[in-house]
């Protein structure tokens, strides 16, 4: 198993699952962007039908999303890894979307794994940036929530993590016809 999943992010999983349950009843078919991961299993154990993408490079081939179906798409800790999340958001094959992203922290650098070029954050959003991206890509935000992520270490930065929101979740629905634009895909 990937080393990043050795210790489950309990708080993030709990918060994400609570939001999912609010907007998607058990039995909902979910397209979970990204390869299968521990949270895919959590969703299945909670009664959801989960399909994952297969590791396609969605930056280069967002149209591959047409090969998938789902009543709701989850993009959980995914958009920050994409060079161009706008194209992916436009090509999602569902009318409902749950997104979580790490927020940009003013006191920490963006995440980067020097050993794996796919494991880095091209974007660490501020909440308003993700909101604008979603709206521009044709989604209407219905719910949003932020939370902190304390790390249990000593120091100034760990202390700041107790007070500074680290994660941002958004539930949105596709705009079918809007005064600003008409969805064309």
Model-derived segments and their meaning:
Residues 1-72, 86-91, 95, 117-132, ...:
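Conserved N-terminal segment of class I S-adenosyl-L-methionine
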Residues 31, 76, 99:
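Active-site flanking residues adjacent to catalytic metal/cofactor-binding acidic residues
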Residues 33, 78-81:
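Generic detector of well-ordered alpha-helical packing
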Residues 72-78:
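A short beta-strand submotif of the Rossmann-like class I SAM-dependent methyltransferase core
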Residues 79, 88, 103:
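Flexible, active-site-proximal loop/turn residues at the rims of small-molecule/cofactor binding pockets
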Residues 83-87, 109:
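Short N-terminal helix/helix-N-cap motif within the alpha/beta-hydrolase-1
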Residues 99-123:
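Short, glycine-/aromatic-enriched active-site segment of Class I SAM-dependent methyltransferases
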Residues 133-139:
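A structural motif corresponding to the C-terminal end of an alpha-helix
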């Amino acid at each position: 198993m990937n080393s990043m999943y050795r210790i489950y992010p309990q708080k993030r999983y709990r918060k994400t699952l609570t939001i999912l349950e609010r907007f998607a009843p058990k039995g909902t078919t979910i397209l979970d962007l990204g390869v299968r991961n521990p949270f895919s299993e959590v969703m299945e154990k909670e009664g959801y039908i989960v399909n994952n993408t297969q590791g396609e490079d969605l930056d280069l081939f967002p149209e591959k999303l047409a090969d998938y179906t789902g009543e709701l798409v989850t993009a959980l800790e995914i958009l920050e890894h994409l060079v161009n999340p706008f194209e992916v958001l436009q090509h999602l094959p569902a009318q409902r979307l749950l997104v979580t992203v790490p927020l940009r922290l003013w006191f920490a650098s963006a995440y980067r794994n020097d050993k794996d070029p796919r494991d880095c954050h091209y974007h660490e959003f501020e909440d308003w940036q993700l909101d604008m991206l979603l709206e521009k890509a044709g989604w209407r935000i219905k719910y949003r929530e932020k939370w902190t992520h304390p790390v249990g270490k000593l120091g100034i930065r760990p202390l700041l993590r107790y007070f500074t929101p680290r994660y941002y979740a958004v539930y949105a629905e596709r705009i079918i016809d809007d005064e600003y634009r008409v969805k064309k895909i």
